[in-house]
């Protein structure tokens, strides 16, 4: 094994390919925090969880479970190494335990049911289905639990102050997995993970951005821990890690069929805190000490845009503010849910109708947005209104074209010819008696889904008249 990058006979790419393949599976499995915060889009306020419940009793076991028990005995040793890497001293001890897959699934359900009511979960599912991001007949909660219970192989619970190791994790992955979770315990002692993990009502994009800090920091520490164990020097780690997140996720996808088959909205939400978070932490840290990331915990990014483009975090660029009003033209519709999609989810949404690269480019000019769902009694799917602001009019035109392709896709009319860029005051397609439409006014872009066809023009005019989207500008972090 080489002792530094670029050593004779072994390239930097080969070294990190080895590390990446070794860690690809557990990289997606850490942190109950992000696994729950990311897929759920931020509806509802969190209720404090009990902190007095004892950790599960550790039973004697065999095979991988026995290995998990043995690993728990190495917590103190691994903690010392993590503290040396990251520089956050341990303020107090934390409990530790081993959970079966069934026990972890129960913990996942407990956490989600505590944070979200059945009505909130149902409302979120209906909006995702109207957006075309979930099959209409999908059981959203079942999909969520199946994916999470398969991926979560260990976690630190900030409510119980307890670190858990899964009994099925292969032994060669357990030490870096434990290093990641120990870092979460240290984060909790210094920055209060309960505060960062608490669902943010109507701010799912901001919640994902905060999750990226927590998981990006944990993943970067894990990578450095693994690199040192392989004899690799860490001086150039920030530079390498700043480009490694996407490669790591591609490796994880290739070894995890369930992720490949999962709806893109769940897959991207689950992966984002680790992949983009790793690259964000590495880019912000650059050649600075780890204390630079301590400052990020105290003033975390407020949007996935800031995570995807660290320069926008460093310059303090803030999302646009979107204000709304009731739909007087459709008084029978009542508000169901609202949320900020953010650059990441616009990319996911646009990618339904075009390549991921083109969707990423179209979403890159995102400035701010708000998605509001309206429901009428007796209807299966809600009416959606998505108003967004874009950095420049050119960016808005590019997003408008992506939205037109999306509307064609949602209505089964992808073969229709698109109008010239920026030349359609109202782009509308129909599915039965429902309209899906796109309209732009300067840097503001409107997408409506599921509007009664006879009301489309009236609804669009009302939204541009009574709703608004304005840039906030820059606020130094």
Describe every region a protein language model picked out:
Residues 91-112, 202-205, 236-246, 299-302:
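Acidic helix-start/capping segments at beta-turn-to-alpha-helix junctions
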Residues 106-119, 139-160:
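Catalytic zinc-binding patch centered on the HExxH motif and its immediate surroundings
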């Amino acid at each position: 094994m080489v002792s530094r990058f670029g050593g004779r006979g072994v390239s930097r790419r080969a070294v990190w390919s080895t590390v990446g393949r070794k860690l690809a599976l557990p990289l997606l499995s850490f942190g109950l925090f992000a696994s729950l915060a990311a897929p759920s889009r931020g509806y509802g306020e969190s209720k404090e969880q009990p902190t007095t419940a004892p950790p599960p009793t550790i039973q004697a076991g065999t095979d991988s479970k026995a290995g998990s028990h043995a690993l728990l005995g190495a917590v103190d040793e691994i903690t010392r190494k993590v503290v040396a890497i990251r520089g956050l001293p341990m303020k107090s001890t934390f409990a530790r335990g081993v959970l079966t897959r069934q026990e972890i699934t129960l913990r996942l359900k407990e956490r989600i049911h505590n944070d979200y009511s059945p009505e909130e979960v149902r409302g979120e599912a209906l909006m995702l289905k109207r957006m075309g991001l979930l099959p209409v007949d999908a059981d959203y909660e079942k999909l969520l639990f199946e994916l999470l219970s398969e991926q979560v192989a260990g976690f630190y619970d900030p409510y119980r102050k307890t670190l858990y190791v899964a009994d099925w994790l292969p032994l060669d992955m357990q030490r870096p997995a434990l290093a990641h979770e120990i870092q979460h315990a240290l984060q909790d002692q210094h920055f209060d993970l309960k505060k960062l993990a608490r669902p943010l009502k109507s701010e799912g994009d901001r919640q994902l951005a905060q999750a990226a800090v927590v998981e990006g920091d944990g993943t970067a520490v894990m990578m450095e821990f693994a690199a040192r164990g392989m004899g690799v020097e860490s001086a150039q780690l920030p530079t390498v890690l700043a480009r490694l997140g996407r490669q790591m996720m591609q490796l994880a996808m290739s070894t995890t069929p369930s992720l490949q088959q999962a709806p893109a909205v769940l897959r991207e939400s689950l992966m984002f805190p680790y992949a983009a978070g790793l690259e964000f932490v590495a880019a912000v840290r650059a050649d600075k000490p780890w204390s630079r990331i301590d400052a990020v915990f105290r003033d975390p990014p407020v949007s996935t845009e800031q995570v995807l483009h660290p320069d926008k975090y460093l310059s303090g660029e803030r999302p646009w503010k979107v204000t709304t009003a009731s739909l007087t033209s459709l008084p029978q519709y009542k508000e169901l849910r609202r949320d900020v999609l953010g650059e990441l989810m616009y990319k996911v949404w646009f990618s339904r109708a075009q390549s991921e690269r083109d969707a990423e480019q179209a979403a890159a000019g995102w400035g701010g947005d708000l998605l509001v769902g309206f429901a009428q009694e007796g209807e299966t799917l809600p009416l959606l209104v998505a108003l967004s602001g874009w950095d420049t009019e050119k960016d808005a035109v590019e997003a408008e074209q992506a939205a037109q392709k999306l509307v064609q896709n949602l209505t089964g009319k992808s073969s229709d010819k698109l109008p010239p860029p920026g030349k359609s005051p109202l782009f509308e397609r129909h599915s039965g008696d429902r309209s899906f439409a796109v309209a732009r006014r300067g840097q503001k872009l409107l997408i409506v889904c599921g509007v009664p066809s006879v009301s489309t023009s009236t609804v669009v005019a009302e939204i541009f008249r009574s709703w608004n989207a304005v840039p906030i500008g820059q606020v130094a972090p």
